[in-house]
Amino acid sequence: MEIPHIPVLLNEVQEIFKNLKTGYFLDCTLGFGGHSEALLKNHPDLKFIACDQDQQALEFSKKRLKDFHNRITFIQSNFSEVLEKISYKEELRGILADIGVSSFQLDNNERGFSVNSDFLDMRMNQNSKISAYEIINTYTKEQLTSIFKDYGELHDAHFIAEKICLERSKNPIKSAKELYQIIGKGKQNHRKISKATLAFQAIRIEVNQELKVLKDFLGHLENLKPKNCILAIISFHSLEDRIVKNFFKKWSKNCICDEKIMRCECGNNHSLGQIITKKAISASKEELLKNSRSSCAKMRAFYFNNLDNK
């Protein structure tokens, strides 16, 4: 079986979860099963719940992981909703979310993620109603400016939005290739990433509501308050990493009083656990040589030891 995607930070993920023995492991973003396959092999007593919203990825992974069929349950769902769909919440001992786009999705022409694509789609869930085509051809100039500024951190967001609106007034923009030509190939000041790459990333975030989905998922976990459970999240965008970092920082604090208050009034017992990774884990030099797409990957991990489930 040809594997269409190389899992990022595979060794680092295995290291984070190396001490897991029994219970359930939730792979929130199964993709093509690389992380789950390695963990299934190394943890024979763990049971797995594998989730993905991409039907193609799910079908592939069912075949790839067929030897473990008696230990794994598959769910098609966005990862922000998966906690509502599982029955073993109290037995969760490990949770992994790799929230990047797979190589298969990037390289698949019809999915419209790549700047070289003949399509303009970018939906991770093909059943979603809004695609990049609708956003590029129907959003107002102000809405497009906001997307490029907030999600792409592009200084000339207004200019890019203006160019798009001008071109679509002549004819609808139908392909990623066409959009790429409109945006241009220049770099964003001194950043290594091209302006078009940042703009495409911003559009993808809007199409899939990626930041909202991440916040919703972390909010559900905060309400769930797992016990004796390790959470690891791999992100590929600075905005996503910032969200994860801030949630972990919040969860690790005992005191949740306003910083302006001189003395603690909350009981000083609100910590959900400890941050495992003092700083984000990045790909090694060896991995970068094998898989250049791992260059943006950042993993953070948190241990929920909320034994009293306050």
Curated annotation (Swiss-Prot):
<protein>
    <recommendedName>
        <fullName>Ribosomal RNA small subunit methyltransferase H</fullName>
        <ecNumber>2.1.1.199</ecNumber>
    </recommendedName>
</protein>
<keyword id="KW-0698">rRNA processing</keyword>
<dbReference type="InterPro" id="IPR002903">
    <property type="entry name" value="RsmH"/>
</dbReference>
<feature type="binding site">
    <location>
        <position position="79"/>
    </location>
    <ligand>
        <name>S-adenosyl-L-methionine</name>
    </ligand>
</feature>
<dbReference type="InterPro" id="IPR023397">
    <property type="entry name" value="SAM-dep_MeTrfase_MraW_recog"/>
</dbReference>
<feature type="binding site">
    <location>
        <begin position="33"/>
        <end position="35"/>
    </location>
    <ligand>
        <name>S-adenosyl-L-methionine</name>
    </ligand>
</feature>
<dbReference type="InterPro" id="IPR029063">
    <property type="entry name" value="SAM-dependent_MTases_sf"/>
</dbReference>
<dbReference type="GO" id="GO:0070475">
    <property type="term" value="P:rRNA base methylation"/>
</dbReference>
<feature type="binding site">
    <location>
        <position position="98"/>
    </location>
    <ligand>
        <name>S-adenosyl-L-methionine</name>
    </ligand>
</feature>
<keyword id="KW-0808">Transferase</keyword>
<keyword id="KW-0949">S-adenosyl-L-methionine</keyword>
<feature type="binding site">
    <location>
        <position position="105"/>
    </location>
    <ligand>
        <name>S-adenosyl-L-methionine</name>
    </ligand>
</feature>
<keyword id="KW-0489">Methyltransferase</keyword>
<feature type="binding site">
    <location>
        <position position="52"/>
    </location>
    <ligand>
        <name>S-adenosyl-L-methionine</name>
    </ligand>
</feature>
<keyword id="KW-0963">Cytoplasm</keyword>
<dbReference type="Pfam" id="PF01795">
    <property type="entry name" value="Methyltransf_5"/>
</dbReference>
<dbReference type="GO" id="GO:0071424">
    <property type="term" value="F:rRNA (cytosine-N4-)-methyltransferase activity"/>
</dbReference>
<dbReference type="GO" id="GO:0005737">
    <property type="term" value="C:cytoplasm"/>
</dbReference>
<comment type="function">
    <text>Specifically methylates the N4 position of cytidine in position 1402 (C1402) of 16S rRNA.</text>
</comment>
<comment type="similarity">
    <text>Belongs to the methyltransferase superfamily. RsmH family.</text>
</comment>
